[in-house]
């Protein structure tokens, strides 16, 4: 369908997150300067606008992805914008839901979404619901363990010996507030041609 759209300029993006973020895409297509404003609309809202002009009715139906390591069978659901997240999650098989382990529901993805309670609601612009382990457990002297089952982008843990292993990440921060350490990892992973460390220092 998108390939048949006329009168528009098309740009194609691929790669890992955050290649799909509109801010990153704008940065690479036509970077904005101070004081400029850019309007964006996603494909589902284009369809919403089209249905309104075609029928004269506001139809807020949308497709939402139910994802996350705690969902045994990720899939898509048709819902109304602002629907209760319970109406989506209860249709799925949630891993460990019956053995007392908690899980966190996120309206959106794990990096940019927001936590919602089981009786909460999907955000108007939300296209995804993510369910991950709550991380309400603690390790005794975890800092002194080899951490063979913990993910790290550096070689802090011995898990770098198994680079193909897939991990189930939870919300446990493994400690409290720590000092900001300059490691160069922000420069390595940020997909923009800026100096992230200087930006973070200016913000802090």
Language model regions located:
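Buried, small/hydrophobic-residue-enriched core segments of structured protein domains
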Residues: 1-204
